[in-house]
């Protein structure tokens, strides 16, 4: 990726000037930490948890809350390094981070104890506490530490004890809630897991999405027309990772002369130039999210409807979002991806999702009410999407071998079906003298 493209970020944001948004979450987190409250930050893959932890690790960001040195020392640990470590290695890494932070804060620390022991860690924390400083430990990828089979309930009880003795606070970041990520039930029973306030980290707001484009483009001295930015946000939604992908490919298309940045209006053909590369790069990430869903959740996501617990869980994973009390896909690229998946028990074609067993139909997430005859016609058309289905075959699907002296009965049924599936009735295309087909109306 060329350095001239300001949307190059794919991993964690490490520079303060590149960080965008999350003002509300930051204020809440820092306010809680100032009061010694531990926090469990939960959010799906690539939503920006690591970026947020790195950002608040910067002293000027914490200063307004009096969490800067020497008032408070922040220690950031990446738990990927500790996935299989024994307790001694965890203590030693914590101790090293504390000593570095204490040195930067000009605190005087006596380190006569042997490193790699709980006693050494406790001794240093005691000295820091006596000098009036608080400590916050940031634990990124915390599920790897919590699932470490070398760490017993006693280990986590000791970590909890440090909060009582020295007012130490923890900020953990994980994809799933703490109760779902521990290696054993006995570990979960540790009082350590009862001290956290849970904070979800979700999608950007619309304003934050626009700010991301504005900031990235401004720093690079580049521009994108507002109409193009609006389309990109509609395409990939408000997920910061996918917004970076969209911005990157838009700049590449302009640099390659595939799109004219000076235009005020763009055609569908212009947008299609962007859709391809954006969806190709997003495919593997969407595939990862899909494969990590249970079959039940895949079914619920495909119809954007189902048990409220499943819908809320998919919302927490930033796959669905609630708009006017209705759950909708978080992005157009996600909707297209889901439509390409094979979901047992469902037929997916165009805007329609059909559950044959339950006799239910949805059009772009909205449940439609069809008669048995209308349902049978739509099922047959959706099974052969893009192909012409002969009128005789449609009649057979509805009436079987029953002879009815009404040559217009199929036309009448199709007309009623189009009204029933409005505004998607124009997907049902008449092929004069042959039959009907389900395909996009513009084709």
Predicted regions and their residues:
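P-loop NTPase Walker A phosphate-binding motif
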Residues: 44-74
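Conserved NTP-binding/hydrolysis module of P-loop NTPases
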Residues: 73-107
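Conserved P-loop NTPase "ATPase switch" module shared by AAA+ and STAND
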Residues: 128-152
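Sensor-1/coupling segment of RecA-like P-loop NTPase cores
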Residues: 144, 148, 156-188
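Conserved small helical "lid"/interfacial subdomain of P-loop NTPases
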Residues: 199-228
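Winged-helix-like regulatory helical subdomains adjacent to P-loop NTPase cores
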Residues: 225-226, 234-317
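A structural micro-motif at secondary-structure boundaries
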Residues: 353-376, 430, 437-443
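Positively charged, aromatic-enriched patches within helix-turn-helix-type DNA-binding elements
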Residues: 365-368, 377-413, 419-422
